[in-house]
């Protein structure tokens, strides 16, 4: 009898605990600086900067910026400005030095697993704008895919190589990349579990006139959340019926 009462008491205590008591610890956070530039900061303090831009495209470069690692999806100046970072970070490039092939990245750096998948900057197998790289980061049970300047919908081999995605960073501005309609198709292909963050589109700050705004991509979508901060927390969670589209400001 006493054991039954004890079990009932323990169950009541567990049920009374707030929901956040059972939540998984945060994996880290993402900050968007504009264009395709994101900073991933892990809970352990690792800082990875993706596709830093050069001066002259309208966005500000923070002074004294620190990062452990910089990833470069392709060698265009709005994506490969290593000087964005103070000091001497480790640089992981997606393309070979001659830009005619992809590097092979599949390694663990501190608490982050990093790998890459070769894709194209256009829908002509690179004939117009060259090669591009998808980088996949995994930390704390969360997989983040940064599509760089993806210029096409994905084929079966590319989809298999990318694999499961929780958080998708996807270009939507067209002209140099997929536009809003093709971005929607790529999301349908990859089926991210948690979140989609659009990037590489026209904003009030951007001086790249050829870019489209995010309006075409967002048109008709119901699951959109517009944030007031350019930083968002990352935590492992169950898959949603449809990934939430999170629009970040660039500062």
Task: State the predicted function of each range.
Residues 67-77:
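Metallo-beta-lactamase
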Residues 55-59, 75-81, 152-155, 175-181, ...:
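Active-site environment of divalent metal-dependent phosphoester hydrolases
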Residues 46, 89, 191-195:
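A short helix->loop->beta-strand "cap" motif at the edges of active sites that frequently abuts
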Residues 193-251:
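Accessory terminal helices/loops
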Residues 1-7:
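Positively charged n-region of N-terminal signal peptides that target proteins for export
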Residues 67, 166-170, 174, 180-201:
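Proline-aspartate-enriched helix->loop->beta-strand connector
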Residues 23-69, 90-163, 167, 175-178, ...:
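Core dinuclear metal-dependent hydrolase active-site scaffold
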Residues 8-18:
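Bacterial N-terminal signal peptides
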